[in-house]
Amino acid sequence: MSISSKFQLRSSTSLLLLVALMVVMGMDGAAAAPNTNFVSSACNTQKIPSGNPFFTNLRAMLADLKQNTAFSGFDYKTSRAGSGGAPTAYGRAICKSSISQSDCSACLSNLVGRIWGICSNAIGARVQLTDCFIQYEQHSF
């Protein structure tokens, strides 16, 4: 085997390893977690009384936002009709268009889990994380 053949073989092997490394790094970047850093919030000062049936509507509406926003163009509005005289819960969720569907869902799951700590029992709230946003109210918007 000549020196030039050995060089071409090493060069081809190096190129192949470089391409494989780039693919692996690219795949890792695609699987990165969404940015869930807190950005801002606006919480209604009125609180939902403990045991109020509005909580049931609100929880169902937030679950709907979490489940469907990523598959509805990253901007989804919904409502949950009041049962037993409870007010209807209205909501909207938005994810940055630059993130993946799975990152959108993950960001909203994170936000739904944190929203009560940010806007404790508020009848309306707007909370923004870096990659996603949720608004909910007792009135249509």
From Swiss-Prot:
MF-aspect GO terms: D-mannose binding
Disulfide bonds: 43-119, 95-104, 107-132
Any GO BP: defense response to fungus
Pfam families listed in its UniProt record: Stress-antifung
Coiled-coil annotated spans: none
Keywords from the named record: Antibiotic, Antimicrobial, Disulfide bond, Fungicide, Lectin, Mannose-binding, Plant defense, Signal
Record: residues binding alpha-D-mannopyranose: 44, 126, 137
Domain Gnk2-homologous: 36-141
Record-linked CDD domains: Gnk2-like (cd23509)
Signal peptide interval: 1-32
Function recorded in the entry: Exerts antifungal activity through its carbohydrate-binding specificity.
UniProt-recorded name of the protein: Antifungal protein ginkbilobin-like protein 1
Organism encoding this protein: Picea glauca (White spruce)
Gene: EMB24
